[in-house]
């Protein structure tokens, strides 16, 4: 019996695993292959179904904002239309697209786009191609990025918007004209509004941007005397204030534009994302924002007062160490025998980050404040601030949490590791006019990360392997610790 379930003739995306193999209910068929029945894994039982409800006009309660689910719904509907046009299927596109491929493919697009965005963000923070290449490569070959981009959960969507917003924000900070500064600031507001409409954690990204703008102003004008009326006037009207704002904008104009970008636009986008709730009658137009506000309160109460536990829950301080990853899927019945080893086949999918990337990023994150202060390094300061604002908000939360809540912080763990590696790569020994020694360290580090990715690939994709190869401890299988099972 074969030990891989890939069927090139199956659903579109089969070979890259979008629809298959991680579906519940593997069973050997008489033809000695594996049948891929439809099925949800982990929180797909909520988000994929809620997305389908959005298409069908069915009311539901979910404590997360609606935009990410609407994007999943767009994927389901589009795939349903594809089946009608290219397969000759008959029926409602919403129902025809309600398949694993339908609710997963949109996330895969957004997840894939995060990779070049990380390259662009890194290059904008520090115009060093080694830094940018390392950031994109580490993103591409991390297990959490890989998994969350391939399943019907909502987390990849806010991550995409957050990375894009940070990129636009840094483009804005480096603007040279008032026009470019205004355009990029407003675009940043639009994207951060989309991020908040996908998940509330994006509010932390917005807070970090506002903090950076405030620090820029304070640092630039800390020497101004503001204790007198004349000093206050100088803060608001002096020509000396112009350069403090990106693009040379005057401070009063810039503050007004920032209020529009960071308050008005996100509020409008967030409110607009709830229009489907009004359209299907779950909210009533006659009540104005009353139903929406009540829903927000219920969502907050859910997060604040949830007391349920979960066997794969983990405390926030354990996440960087990969103490307790989440098993999204596991199957050990009816998969057959591995022809090479004679072991029973098992299949699983664990939300485990790439250990090489995660563990080596920890000292890099710790080093960032030192580099920021010693070298007055904006990239180091920005990455450190981004990590803290995406990670620490989880600390006071008492409800059950999971490793994937580290997703936002992972952006900056990757950037921290890439930044330190790129710093080490600078000034290497030149041979034939080319610097080799230190860049070799960076390339070797990335190569090991790729090897780790290849090794753990089966437990990120649900490909059946021998049980010892899966469950064996360190040096034997992929589940190195009992807490990983």
For every predicted segment, state its role:
Residues 5, 10-11, 22, 26, ...:
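Transmembrane helical bundles and short interhelical boundary loops of multi-pass, membrane-embedded
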Residues 84-94, 113, 118-141, 176-183, ...:
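Transmembrane-helix signature of polytopic, membrane-embedded enzymes
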Residues 10, 15-25, 36-48, 59-74, ...:
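Extracytoplasmic catalytic/substrate-binding loops of multi-pass membrane glycan-assembly enzymes
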């Amino acid at each position: 019996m074969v030990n891989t379930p890939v069927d090139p003739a199956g659903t579109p995306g089969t070979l890259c695993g979008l629809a298959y193999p991680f579906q519940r209910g593997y069973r050997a068929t008489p033809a000695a292959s594996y049948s891929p029945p439809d099925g949800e894994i982990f929180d797909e039982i909520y988000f994929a179904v809620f997305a389908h409800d959005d298409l069908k006009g069915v009311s539901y309660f979910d404590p997360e904002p609606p935009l990410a689910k609407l994007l999943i719904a767009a994927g389901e509907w589009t795939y349903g239309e594809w089946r009608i046009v290219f397969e000759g299927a008959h029926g409602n596109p919403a129902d025809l697209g309600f398949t694993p491929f339908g609710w997963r493919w949109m996330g895969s697009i957004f997840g894939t786009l995060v990779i070049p965005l990380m390259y662009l963000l890194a290059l904008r923070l520090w115009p060093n191609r080694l830094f940018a290449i390392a950031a994109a490569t580490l993103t591409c070959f991390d297990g959490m990025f890989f998994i969350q981009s391939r399943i019907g959960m909502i987390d990849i969507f806010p991550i995409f918007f957050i990375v894009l917003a940070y990129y636009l924000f840094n483009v804005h900070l480096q603007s040279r004209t008032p026009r470019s500064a205004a355009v990029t600031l407003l675009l940043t507001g639009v994207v951060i509004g989309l991020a908040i409409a996908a998940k509330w954690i994006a509010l932390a990204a917005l807070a970090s941007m506002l903090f950076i703008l405030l620090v820029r102003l304070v640092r630039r004008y800390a020497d101004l005397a503001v204790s007198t009326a004349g000093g206050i006037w100088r803060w608001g009207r002096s020509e000396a204030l112009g350069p403090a704002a990106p693009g040379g904008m005057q401070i009063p104009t810039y503050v007004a534009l920032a209020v529009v970008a960071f308050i008005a636009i996100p509020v409008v986008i967030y409110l607009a994302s709830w229009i489907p709730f009004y359209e299907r009658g779950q909210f009533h137009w006659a009540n104005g924002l009353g139903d929406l506000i009540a829903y927000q309160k219920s969502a907050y109460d859910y997060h604040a007062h949830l007391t349920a536990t979960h066997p794969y829950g983990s405390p926030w301080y354990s996440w960087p160490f990969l103490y307790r990853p989440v098993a999204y899927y596991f199957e050990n019945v009816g998969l057959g025998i591995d022809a090479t080893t004679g072991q029973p086949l098992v299949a699983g999918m664990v939300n485990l980050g790439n250990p090489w990337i995660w563990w080596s990023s920890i000292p890099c994150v710790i080093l960032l404040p030192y580099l920021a202060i010693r070298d007055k390094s904006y990239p180091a300061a920005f990455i450190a601030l981004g990590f803290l604002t995406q990670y620490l908000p989880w600390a006071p939360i008492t409800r059950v949490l999971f490793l994937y809540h580290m997703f936002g912080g992972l952006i900056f763990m990757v950037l921290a590791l890439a930044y330190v590696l790129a710093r080490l790569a600078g000034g290497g020994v030149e041979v034939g006019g080319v610097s080799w020694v230190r860049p070799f360290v960076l390339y070797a580090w990335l190569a090991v990360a790729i090897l780790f990715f290849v090794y753990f690939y089966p437990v990120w994709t649900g490909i059946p392997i021998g049980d010892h190869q899966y469950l064996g401890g360190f040096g034997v299988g992929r589940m190195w610790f009992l807490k990983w099972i």
